[in-house]
Curated annotation (Swiss-Prot):
Taxonomic superkingdom: Eukaryota
Organism: Mus musculus (Mouse)
InterPro entries: Map3k7cl
Name under which the protein is recorded: MAP3K7 C-terminal-like protein
Gene it is expressed from: Map3k7cl
Domain characteristics, as noted in the entry: Contains a C-terminal domain similar to that of the C-terminal section of MAP3K7.
Tissues in which the protein is found: Ubiquitous.
Length: 142
């Protein structure tokens, strides 16, 4: 089972083994990592049988796979972080789009209100002019 827990990208992987295919007569236990901290227990490399070339090769392969696994997990973590950044940018762009649409609607409403008010002002000016004319006619007839 693969864990979904994140491995820090800056966490070093320590792998120690001999690239010499000949088995040592006195292998050093310190040279073989017993634990890869980022791996689950069932994925940990088992210590090799030092008398078996095949066992050492399998162990080396397992260590290389563990290192590749660490690199893949690191890349996945970076990609997930990038995904979060892109989602945040997309959310921001959608919010700005909605804000722009709202501003367009508000502008259209204000433009219509302005047109209506100009028409009302024009009617008021016309009525005022008619009242002046009527007032002048009354003044002239009295």
């Amino acid at each position: 089972m693969i864990s979904t827990a994140r491995v820090p990208a800056d966490k070093p992987v320590r792998i120690a083994f001999s690239l010499n295919d000949a088995p040592d007569d006195t292998p050093s236990e310190d040279a073989i990592p017993l634990v890869f901290p980022e791996l689950e227990q069932q994925l940990q490399p088992l210590p090799p049988c030092h008398d078996s070339v095949e066992s050492m090769q399998v162990f080396k392969q397992h260590c290389q796979i563990a290192e590749e696994y660490h690199e893949v997990k690191k890349e996945i973590a970076l990609l997930e972080e990038r995904k979060k950044e892109l989602i945040a940018k997309l959310d921001q762009a959608e919010k700005e789009k909605l804000d722009a649409a709202q501003l367009v609607q508000e502008f259209e409403a204000l433009t219509e209100e302005n047109r209506t008010l100009k028409m009302a002002q024009s009617q008021c000016v016309e009525q005022l002019e008619n009242l002046r004319i009527q007032y002048q006619k009354r003044q002239g007839s009295s």
